[in-house]
């Protein structure tokens, strides 16, 4: 097996500004015009033809004739019976930790009096209906069911719909059962996103769609989120990525394993090592080659390593600065006192601190969510959490005294904006209150 290109050490300080910018560029994910047009056609057909279009696309893209789009309860029970106890116990432990972490994210009611007689509240309500897309293929992702289904249940979403390409893996069906998801449909690709966004005879329309997917799924989510008749989505999606910051005390084998755990996701994944220690970087390159030989998805990982980087910096501070500029989906701090620099980390989806916090823990069972912003969106987007399955509402209630105390402020600002109806809504009430007060005084 030929070695990868992931064995060339790059000295950051010796690179020009343009070269540094190029080093932090990600593999292109822009949908081609062909994909954009194809997805648009799929969306329109599903909206117009419903289940008929869904069956046609399943035959064309998944090479499966789907008679019943919805998976029955008996089919889910049969899938559960086929799974080993080890897998079931592992999923149960993962769900427990995910529940603990996401339950802790419940937002308290905000209830304050901003001035006498003016009461303001912030309350939350669950999104009524959500759709979860779970990719299929050679590597089913039941962990994503747990990461999406658990917060949806905790939030109290009344309807949770799950779509996955046929045939749906037993692990995915069991994970759905574990999360209390009863509406499961064997549809994949852009057509599944269309079904959840618009609804069909079998698939209910939802308000918001979650979950990862290929370029067609990603483009479908983008398009439905921009249509008035579509649905909201969780966040923009891109290929998986990890950045590791390592000092001279780091363990090369651990670093290599974490880098490869992301590289095996797909050929467009990207992994980066930043270290002030050239010896560590070189040792990691050797470890990567040795561990690659043991991986079932070695060919995929090798492709990902072609656009990955081993970067040697001047010092740890430079590593931090580069990481914040890149904004990785996963950030691993393989340094001696990671807690001393966490306050300097501004842009990352999820951070893993120390030798004993592998990225795999967050992917599966530590309790944090593995649905994270990628492609630099960490500068503006957060990791998925309970807040994504609820919406906030504000409430205000003014007493007569409260309105009188605030009236002149509102009237002045409304007049400044030349919105006289706004001003009048206050003035009429103030007049009514003053008239009532005058009448009482006369009595």
Swiss-Prot record:
* Top-level taxon: Bacteria
Q: Which residues bind substrate?
A: 240, 262, 265, 330, 363, 417, 422
What residues bind Zn(2+), as annotated?
Answer: 262, 265, 363, 422
- Any single Pfam family the record assigns to this protein: Histidinol_dh
Active site (catalytic residues): 329 (proton acceptor), 330 (proton acceptor)
This protein's assembly is summarised as:
Homodimer.
What the record says about family reads: Belongs to the histidinol dehydrogenase family.
Query: Which NCBIfam families does this entry report, sorted A to Z?
Result: hisD
What protein does this entry describe?
Histidinol dehydrogenase
Taxonomic lineage: Bacteria, Pseudomonadati, Pseudomonadota, Gammaproteobacteria, Enterobacterales
Q: Which gene encodes it?
A: hisD
């Amino acid at each position: 097996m030929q070695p990868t290109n992931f064995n060339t050490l790059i000295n950051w300080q010796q690179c020009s500004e343009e070269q540094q910018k190029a080093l932090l560029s990600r593999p292109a994910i822009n949908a081609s015009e062909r994909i954009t047009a194809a997805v648009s056609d799929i969306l329109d057909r599903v909206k117009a033809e419903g289940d008929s279009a869904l069956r046609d696309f399943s035959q064309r893209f998944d090479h499966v004739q789907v008679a019943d789009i919805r998976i029955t309860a008996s089919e889910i029970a049969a899938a559960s019976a086929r799974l080993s106890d080890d897998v079931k116990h592992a999923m149960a432990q993962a769900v427990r930790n995910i529940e603990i972490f996401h339950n802790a994210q419940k937002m308290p009611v905000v209830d304050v009096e901003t001035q006498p007689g003016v009461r303001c509240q912030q309350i939350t309500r669950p999104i009524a209906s959500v759709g979860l897309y779970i990719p299929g293929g050679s590597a089913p992702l039941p962990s994503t069911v747990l990461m999406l289904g658990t917060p949806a249940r905790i939030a109290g979403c009344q309807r949770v719909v799950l779509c996955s390409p046929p045939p749906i893996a037993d692990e995915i069906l069991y994970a759905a059962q574990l999360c209390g998801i009863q509406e499961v449909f064997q549809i994949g690709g852009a057509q599944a996103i269309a079904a959840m966004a618009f609804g069909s005879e079998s698939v209910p329309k939802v308000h918001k769609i979650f979950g990862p997917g290929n370029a067609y799924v990603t483009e479908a989510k983008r398009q439905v989120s921009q249509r008035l008749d579509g649905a909201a989505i969780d966040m923009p999606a891109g290929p998986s990525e990890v950045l590791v910051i390592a000092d001279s005390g780091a363990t090369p084998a651990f670093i290599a394993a974490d880098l490869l755990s992301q590289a095996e996701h797909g050929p467009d994944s990207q992994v980066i090592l930043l270290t002030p220690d050239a010896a560590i970087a070189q040792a990691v390159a050797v470890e990567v080659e040795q561990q690659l030989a043991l991986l079932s998805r070695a060919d995929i990982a090798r492709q990902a390593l072609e656009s990955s980087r081993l970067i040697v910096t001047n010092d740890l501070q430079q590593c931090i600065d580069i990481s914040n500029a890149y904004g990785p989906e996963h950030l691993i701090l393989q340094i001696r006192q990671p807690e001393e620099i966490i306050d300097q980390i501004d842009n990352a989806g999820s951070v893993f601190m120390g030798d004993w916090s592998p990225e795999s823990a967050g992917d599966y069972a530590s309790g944090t969510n593995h649905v994270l912003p990628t492609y630099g969106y960490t500068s503006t987007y957060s990791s998925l959490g309970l807040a994504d399955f609820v919406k906030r509402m504000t409430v205000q209630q003014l007493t007569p005294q409260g309105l009188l105390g605030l009236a002149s402020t509102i009237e002045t600002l409304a007049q400044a904006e030349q919105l006289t109806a706004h001003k009048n809504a206050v003035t009429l009430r103030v007049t009514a209150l003053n008239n009532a007060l005058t009448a009482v005084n006369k009595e």
